[in-house]
Amino acid sequence: MSEQTGKVDDSQSPPKVQKKLRKGDLVKVDREKYSNSLESKASDTNLPEYIFQGPGEVLLIKGDYCQVRWRRPVPDVWMNSDHIVSY
């Protein structure tokens, strides 16, 4: 703690590491991360609510993208792994 301000110094703490996604993991889309992304600017703004509520299942992982299957009769989608979080 800094003596002058009484705040915790975060520079000494280790960086937060996001759990690496694996095939079969249950996930959902993080609304805040997705809405601030380049992909959201290029896509329809009226997204279905179920992608934010989850769960979706990771089917494949290629580079920075994951193929996600939702538990609904809809096509599988490829999402940037930065935009999805564990359910």
Swiss-Prot record:
What this protein is reported to do is described as: NDH-1 shuttles electrons from an unknown electron donor, via FMN and iron-sulfur (Fe-S) centers, to quinones in the respiratory and/or the photosynthetic chain. The immediate electron acceptor for the enzyme in this species is believed to be plastoquinone. Couples the redox reaction to proton translocation, and thus conserves the redox energy in a proton gradient. Cyanobacterial NDH-1 also plays a role in inorganic carbon-concentration.
The opening ranks of the lineage are: Bacteria, Bacillati, Cyanobacteriota, Cyanophyceae, Synechococcales
Signal sequence interval, chain numbering? none
The highest taxon in the source lineage is Bacteria
Task: Family membership, please give it.
Answer: Belongs to the complex I NdhO subunit family.
Kindly state the subunit structure of this protein: NDH-1 can be composed of about 15 different subunits; different subcomplexes with different compositions have been identified which probably have different functions.
Keyword line: Membrane, NAD, NADP, Plastoquinone, Quinone, Thylakoid, Translocase, Transport
Q: Which Pfam families match?
A: NdhO
The listed locations are: Cellular thylakoid membrane
Quick check: keyword tRNA-binding in the entry?
no
Question: What is the protein name given in its UniProt record?
Answer: NAD(P)H-quinone oxidoreductase subunit O
Provide the residue span(s) of the region labelled Disordered.
1-26
